[in-house]
Amino acid sequence: MARLGLAVCAASFHLFLLLASTSSLRRAPTEADTANHARRTAYHFQPAKNWQNDPNGPMYHNGMYHLFYQYNPHSALWDIGNLSWGHSVSGDLLNWAALDTALDPTSPFDANGCWSGSATILPGALPAILYTGIDASKEQVQNVAFAKNPSDPLLREWEKPAYNPVIALPADVPGDKFRDPSTAWLGRDGLWRIAVSAEVDGVASTLVYRSKDFVRWERNAAPLHASRAAGMVECPDLFPVAERGEDGLDTSANGAGGVRHVLKLSVMDTLQDYYMVGTYDDAADAFSPAEPERGDDCRSWRRLDYGHLYASKSFFDVRKNRRVLWAWANESDSQADDVARGWSGVQTFPRKMWLAKDGKQLLQWPIEEIETLRRKRAGLWRGTRLGVGAVQEIVGVASSQADVEVVFKIPSLEEAERVDDPNRLLDPQKLCGEKGAAVRGGVGPFGLLVMASGDLHEHTAVFFRVFRHHDKYKLLMCTDLTKSSTRAGVYKPAYGGFVDMDIDDHKTISLRTLIDHSVVESFGGGGRACITARVYPEHVATSSSHLYVFNNGSDAVKVAKLEAWDLATATVNVVVGDHHGLVAPALELEPTRTTQ
C-alpha cells in the first residue's frame, strides 16, 4: 500500500470515526444471523442475512467504493413487494461495511418494490440513481434519486423527488416488462442517454432515452437492439472498451478510433448473460455488432460466463482506470435451505474486463486486490508429468478457501477425440455432461478436483478436453457438478463452453480457480472462458476439503506451473468488534486519495 500523507491519515481517521459512530451501520448480528456456516463465503460479497440478487449502481466516489444490490430486508426469499436497495461501502473492494438501505418502497411510484437500476456521477460530483419502481398499480416505471449530501463519503441518505416517475410506462409496453435503466452516458451533443429493457409489441427490446437534465426523458424512435426470438431481456449494459491495452474507459467515452463498445444483455428465458462487441454511433443511437453472423437473437452471442451467473453490472473504476464487473450467483439448492441458512445469494468476485486482441471477445480476470488476501502458498510445481489416470493432491493450502493458478502443457494433440458431426459442437454444456471428468478421453479431461472429500465421493471437476473436427482443434472447458454433493435436492449440472483460442499454436492452457466454500469461479485461457458454480458438499460438515490435479486422458500432460494459496477471510458486511457493534479496526475504509 502506498504511504499516506498526513492529510490522508487525518481523513482516514475521520472516516473511521464516522463508521464507528453512525447509526447507519448494522449492529453485530446474532450467531444465527451471521450463519457461521461451512457454506458461507469468506471473501465474496453477501449481506449478513436475508435475500440479495442483482448488483446495482456500483461506483467509486470521494475515495470510496459503493455497491448497491437488490435486497429483501425481511426474509431470505425473493418478495416482489419488499425489494429495497441494500448499500455497502469499501476502501478496497474486499472488505465491506453495510449501511442502512439506500432506497425503500415508501412512495406511490415505488410502493411495490425498488427494483434494479444504475448510478451515474453528474456534473458537480452529484451521484444520481435511476431505478425501476413497481408503483401502486404494480406497473414498472423509472425513477430518479439523488444523494442528499454528496460530500458525505458514505452517501448514507438519498432523496426521491416527488415528481417521479421520470419515465412512465410506454403505451406499447406491458406493465411488467419495462425495467433496469443502465448507467447514463453523455453523447457528443451534450444529451444524457440510458438504455432500458422492455418488451415492445412482443419483441425483446433495448430502448434508448435521452435527456438534457436527467429529469425529462425522451425515447429514441429506434431501439438500440431488438430480438423477436429471445424473450424478455434485462439489465442492459452498454460500455466502451479500448481496442488496445487493458485500461478501462469512462462510460461516456466515444470516438471514431481506438474505441469499441460492448452491449451486454441478461436473458430471462435462459438466465444467462450474453454480450457482443461492436461499434456505437451516438448520433443515431445505433449499435453495429462486430460479428453480425451471430444474428439478432442475443442467445447466439458470446456468453459472459458459462455457469451460474446472471444480471451482471459493470462500472468504470476511475481510481485504477479499469472496468470492473459484478454479477449475481444465486443459490442452487432449495428455498427451504435458504430459510434455514437465513441468507441467499452472493455476488461473484469483482472482475477486471478488457478487449482481447482479436477485437471480438472480452477477457475477464479477478481484480488484483485478491492477492492481498493470499497467505500460505503450496509448493510450486514445475514440469510435473501427469500420466494416464493420475490424481495428485495439492497439499499445504486450505482447500475450501483458496486461489489456484495452473498452466498445463500438452505434448501432442494426436490423440484428440475426433468429432465428425459438427452439430455435437453446438451445445458445449451438453457435451460436458456426456464427456465428464470420469469419461476417459484422448487429450483430456485434465484439470482440478476442488471441494473434494478424502475418498473423492464428492468433488467438483474443473477441466479441459480437446476435440478435433476435420483439421481444426476445439478446446472445451467444463465445470462438472454431478459429483459435487451427495445431497438430494441440489442442482448439479455440468457447465461448459469452448475456449476461443488456438490450442494448436502453443499447446498450453492456463486455468485459475477461486474457491470460496460454496462458490467456485474458474477462468480458462487467461480469462477467455469463465465458469461460475455453486456447490454444496456434505463432507464439509465433518471434515476438511481436499484439492487435486488430475488427468484422465489417454495421453500424458505436464503441469508447466502450479501455485496455490490460502486466502484470508475478508470482512464482508458482518460487522464485528465490541458488544456495541463497532467496525473492526482491520476494516480498511480509508479514502484512497494520495498526497505528494
Swiss-Prot record:
Short name of any one Pfam family annotated for the protein: Glyco_hydro_32C
Catalysis: reaction(s): Hydrolysis of terminal non-reducing beta-D-fructofuranoside residues in beta-D-fructofuranosides
Annotated compartments: Secreted, Extracellular space, Apoplast; Secreted, Cell wall
CDD domains linked to this entry: GH32_Fruct1-like
EC number: 3.2.1.26
UniProt record similarity statement: Belongs to the glycosyl hydrolase 32 family.
Active site per UniProt: D54
Superkingdom to which the source organism belongs: Eukaryota
Gene Ontology molecular function, alphabetical: beta-fructofuranosidase activity
Keyword annotations: Apoplast, Cell wall, Disulfide bond, Glycoprotein, Glycosidase, Hydrolase, Secreted, Signal
Name of protein: Beta-fructofuranosidase, insoluble isoenzyme 7
GO aspect biological process, one term: carbohydrate metabolic process
Residues the entry annotates as binding substrate: W51, Q52, N53, D54, Q70, W78, W115, S116, R179, D180, E234
Glycosylation-annotated residues: N82, N330, N552
Disulfide bridges in this chain: C432-C478
Recorded GO CC terms: apoplast
Function comment: May play a role in sucrose partitioning during seed development.
Signal peptide: 1-24
Coiled-coil residue windows: none
